[in-house]
Amino acid sequence: MKGIILAGGSGTRLHPITRGVSKQLLPIYDKPMIYYPLSVLMLAGIREILIITTPEDKGYFQRLLGDGSEFGIQLEYAEQPSPDGLAQAFIIGETFLNGEPSCLVLGDNIFFGQGFSPKLRHVAARTEGATVFGYQVMDPERFGVVEFDDNFRAISLEEKPKQPKSNWAVTGLYFYDSKVVEYAKQVKPSERGELEITSINQMYLEAGNLTVELLGRGFAWLDTGTHDSLIEASTFVQTVEKRQGFKIACLEEIAWRNGWLDDEGVKRAASSLAKTGYGQYLLELLRARPRQY
């Protein structure tokens, strides 16, 4: 399985901040935003990842993340010249995917919760169909909403419904089998002129192959598309890290625990960050070897 992070767009809701920098490079407490979706793919056991961004921002991501080797992964980059919809990611990434199943995560979504990695790996092991992740919200009319049966098979999908059929919002995390590129090519532009991911999900639903995985109590799903939500996400990460003493979305730690990075690799990363709390945290990992997250 391969991963795609969609980190394009113009971030208009965050202007003037994003006039000079990609939204996905903004800080969420102690890390760039892009670290958080990257961590999701790594927790799922995915090592080959494509980052899709704008032509203007691609160089900045390459400077930050390189080829991914310092995190034990392989990174490639592609351009989305204009924000023409989430489904376009699979058309842009067709050569990269090369017929393999994939996971798409949006570059401005943050996920956190106990047992997240086993849940992700369980979904990644499925060989057919698609899986979306549902998160219960108080205001479902603001989201894409999924309705499902007792076997967690999707029954309906609605975009910002006036009368929602459930309180389960569809998050920015999707797993697909190898048919996704074929489906993406069939998607027609919506009324707003975009290739909608909901159209792909609807195709899987109509084929009886759309499963819903729930992120229940204890899970956090944060969108960082507004000024207030940026602060809220940073405060959340700060609170958890200070209270519990471990870091959220520490890519070197995930790679190390996955066996993709050895002790020397962690030491090299720590030495370049020696004057920061992040670097000290990496060194402490090697000394204490604390519990799994």
Swiss-Prot record:
GO CC, alphabetical: cytosol
Cofactor note: Binds 1 Mg(2+) ion per subunit.
Chain sites annotated for binding Mg(2+): 108, 223
SUPFAM superfamilies in UniProt: Nucleotide-diphospho-sugar transferases
EC number: 2.7.7.24
Record-level GO BP terms: enterobacterial common antigen biosynthetic process; O antigen biosynthetic process; polysaccharide biosynthetic process
Keywords, alphabetical: Exopolysaccharide synthesis, Magnesium, Metal-binding, Nucleotidyltransferase, Transferase
Pfam families to which the protein is assigned, alphabetical: NTP_transferase
Cofactor: Mg(2+)
EC top class named in words: transferase
Reactions listed under catalytic activity: dTTP + alpha-D-glucose 1-phosphate + H(+) = dTDP-alpha-D-glucose + diphosphate
Pathway where this protein functions: Nucleotide-sugar biosynthesis; dTDP-4-acetamido-4,6-dideoxygalactose biosynthesis; Bacterial outer membrane biogenesis; enterobacterial common antigen biosynthesis
Entry's Gene Ontology molecular function annotations: glucose-1-phosphate thymidylyltransferase activity; identical protein binding; magnesium ion binding
Subunit composition and interactions: Homotetramer; arranged as a dimer of dimers.
Physiological role: Catalyzes the formation of dTDP-glucose, from dTTP and glucose 1-phosphate, as well as its pyrophosphorolysis.
UniProt similarity note: Belongs to the glucose-1-phosphate thymidylyltransferase family.
Protein's recorded name: Glucose-1-phosphate thymidylyltransferase 2
Gene source species: Escherichia coli (strain K12)
